């Protein structure tokens, strides 16, 4: 399986303040507020980066669109298709690639629509504190 570093999100960092960047994935209107205390890259220019979230809950869902909510602010709900999966993380395509750490607690999964697998549609509710790491 491809690792998260081989599936970065393309987009632009629109601004940075107090260790937080505003990242807009290419082809979207999203403006995700992400922790990135060490960011020293360009503003408003194309960049590649890894967006990471820690889940409160992961569901497999039968259908639906690819989205990140809210459109402006820290990502709270992410729904998309699994592009890559291993025992520690999965990469979801949802208007950009989002790396989701897989929790050990089985109570955090609701797999009513089948197991986690590449190509499956999932919905993730994320904790605050999503991060951005630029890939050079």
Regions flagged by a language model, labelled:
Residues 1-17, 69-91:
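Structural detector for short beta-strands of small beta-barrel domains
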Residues 10-12, 41-58, 115-136:
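Flexible glycine-rich surface loops and low-complexity tracts that mediate binding to linear polymers
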Residues 17-73:
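Acidic (E/D-rich), amphipathic helical modules within compact regulatory domains
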Residues 20, 89, 121:
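Exposed beta-strand and adjacent loop surfaces of beta-rich binding modules
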Residues 26-42, 97-118:
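Beta-strand/loop nucleic-acid-binding surfaces
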Residues 32, 58, 89-91, 133:
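Intrinsically disordered, low-complexity acidic/polar segments
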């Amino acid at each position: 399986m491809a690792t998260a570093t081989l599936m970065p999100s393309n987009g632009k960092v629109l601004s940075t303040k107090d260790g937080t960047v505003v990242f807009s994935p290419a082809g979207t209107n999203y403006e995700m507020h992400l922790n990135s205390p060490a960011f020293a890259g360009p503003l408003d220019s194309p960049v590649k980066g890894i967006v990471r979230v820690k889940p409160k809950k992961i569901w497999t869902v039968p259908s639906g669109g690819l989205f990140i909510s809210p459109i402006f602010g820290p990502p709270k709900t992410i729904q998309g298709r699994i592009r890559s999966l291993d025992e520690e993380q999965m990469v979801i395509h949802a208007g950009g690639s989002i790396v989701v750490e897989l929790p050990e607690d089985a109570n955090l999964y609701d797999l009513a629509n089948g197991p986690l697998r590449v190509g499956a549609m999932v919905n993730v509710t994320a904790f605050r504190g999503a991060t951005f790491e630029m890939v050079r």
